[in-house]
Regions:
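Short, Lys/Arg-enriched N-terminal segments with co-localized hydrophobic residues
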Residues: 1-3
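Lectin-like carbohydrate-binding module/patch detector with strong preference for beta-trefoil
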Residues: 5-164, 168-169
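Composition-driven recognition of long, low-complexity, acid-poor segments enriched in small hydrophobic
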Residues: 159-201
Length: 201
């Protein structure tokens, strides 16, 4: 006869780099970048899970059980606003940097849920006492509240697409590329000008 293996809980599961996950609150709402905003400083909030890329996260290992948590759509990291460490510090996204404000520890519990702790502040990812769509995330001291427990699930379905979101992202990428071209061209132009100047005798 065959013995069925018990379903693995996240507490027993390794977060694999290159895979993507949803981070769900106790009421099933997931953590997302608000309004698929690709800008630095965009808020991180709760929302109904609609299987969009901006509701999915990668865990990038930074050593010793510490991770950077990267949004699948924007490519930016979950970060503490202004590197704050006090209760109520807002959590937002920021481009990846060697910053301690972007380091998080995933602490498993016996029931398969996790606590997500800022490695810098020693405080937990927390939606406050609110649960509705649009609730902005913060950090708060560990009070073992139900709102401080999260469920991490691997994304196995192909994410839904949004023409509007994809257009916004493509436009931003084009603008960034154009800026990089200008930056690269400027030193070359300055060098050419210097070379063209007659030597002063």
């Amino acid at each position: 006869y065959c013995i069925m293996a018990p379903r693995k809980k996240i507490a027993q599961t390794v977060l694999t780099e290159g895979k993507f996950y949803t981070i769900s609150a106790a009421n099933g709402k997931v953590v997302e970048v608000a309004d698929y905003n690709i800008d630095n400083g965009a808020k991180i909030q709760l929302m109904d899970n609609a299987n969009f890329e901006w509701q999915q996260w990668g865990f990038v290992a930074a050593g010793d059980g510490v991770y950077r948590i990267q949004n699948r759509f924007t490519g930016k990291m979950m970060d503490l606003d202004m590197g704050g460490v006090s209760d109520g510090t807002r959590v937002h996204q920021w481009e990846g940097a060697q910053a301690s404000s972007q380091l998080w520890v995933v602490e498993p519990t016996n029931d398969g849920r996790v606590k997500i702790k800022s490695n810098l502040a020693g405080k937990l990812l927390d939606p406050g006492m609110a649960t509705e769509n649009g609730t902005v995330l913060q950090i708060w001291a560990d009070v073992n509240g139900d709102n401080q427990f999260w469920t991490i699930d691997e994304v196995t379905r192909k994410p839904k697409t949004s023409v509007k979101a994809t257009t916004v992202k493509a436009k931003a990428a084009a603008e960034k590329a154009a800026t990089e071209v200008v930056k690269a061209a400027k030193p070359a132009a300055e060098k050419a000008v210097k070379a063209a100047k007659p030597a002063v005798e």
